[in-house]
Design a protein with these regions (language model features):
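C-terminal motif of bacterial Sec signal peptides marking the signal peptidase cleavage site
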Residues: 18-21
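Bacterial N-terminal signal peptides that target proteins for export
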Residues: 1-9
Length: 353
């Protein structure tokens, strides 16, 4: 059962990596369009963006009955939705992000988190919410997070990626996309879609839409191909400093992967018997300049074990606009009177206990 849920979660996460992309000419194949998308993304220096994420999880009755707290957490997750919007530019490094967590049910609660980040600092506006009973003196102020101070306190380096680092990560994203998409058969997983059939919102201007889809029929070859390309993918991920992977950990992962390969057929047999893919696809819409305008992800898996069935569902969307234009920001760096330092907030919390 653990193998089934772990592998299903892995598939879910890998599909999530497809929430980025771009394209080029209409003559290109669908796979070529997605591979070129990451190459084009290295050219992005500024943009507006927005998106949303919604989970839908259903655990077997026996799991919920054994642990009532699990049912409470599950209910909260299923009644919650995350949405976000923001603006970003590389040079000078500046990003603003407006996060909203909406929890519905008997009572609707919305938590809003405005965030502003520059190269060496970040400010988060402290919300007034029953989920976080914070001191009254801190409500409405901006919590200042100085990356150098946090690094000293934690003993680990904490930084906001510089423009050069962000461009490096964009390049790595392109290389990872080439490896990932290149591992899969063109006709089995990729297709061009119309804007209407793909469910792209009306306000998205797009010339091309590409769909990447997993089904019960192509799931086995997907995992088999993934096993082949995973070592190279891990090498690329290890190049990202923030991933924190040492060479020893990379080699250990590769060894474990190789050792588990002998059990792969049996694991896939078990999955094919116990997992149903109702839907697992991502659609990427590309604008006239070859940049991603919209990406949508939808996953719905049913997993059965010992006569009980659970569900894993995820809907996500990401949209960007005003790419490489002169973008306007809504937030400004807060004045000293509006700021509370991290240590000050900790002191207020401890004093109030």
């Amino acid at each position: 059962m653990k193998k089934i849920w772990a592998l299903a979660a892995t598939v879910l996460l890998l599909l999530g990596t497809l929430l980025v992309g771009c394209s080029q000419e209409s003559k290109a194949t669908p796979k070529d369009i997605l591979i070129e998308a990451y190459g084009k993304s290295t050219e992005i220096t500024s943009a507006k963006f927005e998106g949303s994420i919604k989970l839908n999880l259903g655990l077997p009755d026996s799991v919920i009955q054994e642990d009532p707290s699990t049912a409470m957490v599950l209910n909260m997750l299923n009644n919650a939705a995350l949405s976000f919007r923001g603006t970003t530019q590389l040079d000078p490094a500046l990003t603003e992000l407006f996060l909203t967590i909406l929890v519905t049910g008997d009572t609707e609660i919305a938590i809003h988190l405005p965030i502003l980040a520059i190269e060496d600092k970040m400010w988060v506006k402290i919300p007034n919410t029953p989920f976080l009973p914070l001191p009254d003196d801190s409500i409405g102020k901006y919590l200042e997070l100085d990356f150098a101070e946090l690094s000293e306190m934690s003993g680990q380096e904490i930084t906001n990626p510089s423009p050069e680092q962000q461009q490096q990560y964009q390049q790595l994203g392109k290389e990872i996309a080439e490896l990932f998409f290149g591992a899969f058969d063109e006709n089995t997983y990729f297709s061009k879609e119309s804007k209407e059939d793909a469910g792209i919102p009306d306000d998205v201007n797009t010339d091309q839409v590409v769909k990447f889809e997993l089904t019960d029929d192509n799931f086995r070859p997907f995992i088999e191909s993934l096993y082949v390309v995973l070592p190279a993918l891990i090498d690329k991920v290890a190049e990202i400093k923030e991933a924190g992977l040492t060479q020893a950990e990379v080699e250990e992962f590769k060894a474990e992967l190789q050792a588990s390969e002998q059990d792969l057929d049996a694991t896939l047999d078990e999955l094919e018997q116990n997992m149903t893919i109702h839907k697992a696809s991502t659609v990427t819409a590309v604008d006239k300049n070859g940049f991603v305008a919209y990406t949508g992800l939808e996953v719905d898996l049913a997993i059965t074990s010992e006569g009980e069935t659970g569900r894993i569902g995820l809907q996500a969307a990401f949209k960007q606009s005003e790419i490489n234009e002169k973008v306007e920001f809504e937030l400004q760096q807060p004045d000293a009177s509006e700021v509370i330092k991290f240590q000050e907030l900790m002191s207020l919390i401890l004093y109030g206990l």
